[in-house]
């Protein structure tokens, strides 16, 4: 039997993951390089809601309520993503960049926050010789604020840029691939941080967090290099009045399914994110696990999220109600995972703790991809875009 080039190409496209995300406007090499910004956001996420959360409470003895407040700052900034995306949709530039400035500013915020974060945490823990007692509180709040704002800004503009370059046929697959890269970034970061902080010292903490800042800068520089096509705006049009955010938001809420989508995303994300602050300290304080053991928990969560992504990709191929069914299924799975984690201490079974985390990741993966695909396929109207 003679195998033709066409047959080889068809087999390759069916076997290679996300091969159908490629288009002439966004080839695989550019897509994979662009997706590196998701890896940097994954690194920041692991640090903010996982590793540093547990380190501050268990190793450095910071009060849990104070740590929860600091970790909540980046999460509370999440609603600003709607405004940031809207601004990038309507940004006018003489050079012709629309998304790139926002990704770059986000990178700078992220880099700056991570650069000062380890010293701020050490001061907050009580290792302070000069300055007011509240200096550590202000410094840590600023570093978490800067890193969280940078991650939100980078991710929002980066996803919008990818959606701009993708076609209508490939957009959902591009979104799924970018989410996979985000999960891989989290998983690799969790394993790396667990290994590097196995024998915890303050000096190692400084090395790890500042190393993450440098890696973030390099990854984002590689990701955005020559990714956006230049579309210069004439000087006379720069100062023309642009669409206002509030009227556009009202128009979106009046559209079919707009209000429901926002409510589902808000409460679903709130429920799936609240456990992030407590999960690793719970393993350290209640179950007596080491830094490496609790940080590797994130890797287990990532595996669950990847499984959820695979399930979502299968179920969303159905024409009727695919995303809606996936969202409901995801929330019930996550509730079951939380119940297992609660029962892990009374039953003295660490395996329940890990399996519960896997189920939460599974539910989160299903939920995130389903809501992202619904949002990215909303028709564009005047004054709005993919941001």
Specify the residue positions occupied by each region the protein language model found:
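Intracellular loop-helix junctions on the cytosolic face of multi-pass helical membrane proteins
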Residues: 1-28, 127-143, 153-159, 165-266, ...
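Hydrophobic/aromatic end-of-helix segments at the C-terminal termini of transmembrane alpha-helices
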Residues: 48-55, 158, 162, 274-283, ...
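Short amphipathic helix-loop junctions that connect adjacent transmembrane helices
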Residues: 50-66, 277-294
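Helix-to-loop junctions at the C-terminal end of transmembrane segments
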Residues: 79-96, 197, 308-324
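C-terminal ends and interior cores of transmembrane alpha-helices
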Residues: 103-133, 332-348
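Intracellular juxtamembrane helix-capping segments at the cytosolic ends
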Residues: 153-166, 366-382
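C-terminal transmembrane helical hairpin of 12-TM major facilitator-type secondary transporters
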Residues: 324-371
């Amino acid at each position: 039997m003679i195998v033709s080039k066409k047959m080889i190409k068809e087999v390759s496209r069916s076997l290679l993951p996300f091969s159908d995300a490629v288009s002439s406007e966004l080839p695989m090499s550019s897509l994979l390089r662009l997706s590196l910004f998701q890896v940097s956001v994954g690194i920041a996420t692991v640090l903010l809601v996982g590793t540093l959360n547990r380190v501050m409470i268990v190793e450095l003895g910071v009060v849990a309520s104070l740590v929860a407040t600091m970790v909540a700052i980046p999460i509370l900034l999440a609603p600003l993503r709607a405004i940031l995306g809207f601004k990038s949709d309507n940004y006018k530039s003489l050079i012709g960049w629309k998304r790139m400035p926002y990704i770059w500013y986000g990178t700078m915020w992220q880099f700056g926050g991570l650069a000062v974060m380890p010293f701020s945490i050490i001061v907050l823990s009580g290792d302070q010789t000069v300055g007011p007692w509240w200096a550590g509180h202000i410094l840590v709040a600023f570093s978490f604020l800067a890193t969280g704002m940078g991650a939100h800004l980078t991710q929002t503009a980066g996803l919008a840029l990818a959606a701009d370059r993708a076609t209508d046929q490939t957009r959902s697959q591009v979104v799924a691939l970018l989410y996979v890269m985000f999960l891989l970034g989290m998983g690799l970061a969790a394993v790396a941080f667990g290994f590097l902080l196995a024998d915890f010292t303050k000096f190692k903490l400084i090395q790890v967090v500042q190393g993450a800042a440098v890696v973030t800068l390099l990854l984002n520089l590689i990701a955005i290099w020559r990714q956006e096509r230049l579309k210069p705006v004439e000087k006379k049009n720069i100062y023309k009045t642009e669409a206002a955010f509030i009227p556009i938001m009202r128009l979106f809420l009046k559209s079919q399914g707009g209000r429901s989508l926002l409510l589902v995303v808000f409460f679903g994300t709130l429920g799936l994110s609240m456990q992030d602050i407590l999960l690793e300290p719970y393993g350290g304080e209640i179950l007596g696990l080491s830094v490496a053991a609790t940080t590797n928990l994130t890797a287990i969560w990532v595996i669950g999220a990847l499984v959820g992504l695979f399930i979502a990709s299968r179920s969303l191929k159905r024409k009727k109600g695919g995303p809606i069914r996936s969202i409901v299924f995801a929330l019930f799975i996550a509730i079951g995972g939380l119940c297992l984690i609660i029962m892990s201490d009374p039953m003295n079974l660490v395996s329940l703790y890990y399996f519960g985390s896997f189920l939460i990741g599974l539910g989160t993966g299903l939920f995130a991809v389903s809501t992202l695909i619904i949002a990215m396929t909303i028709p564009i109207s005047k004054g709005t875009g993919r941001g």
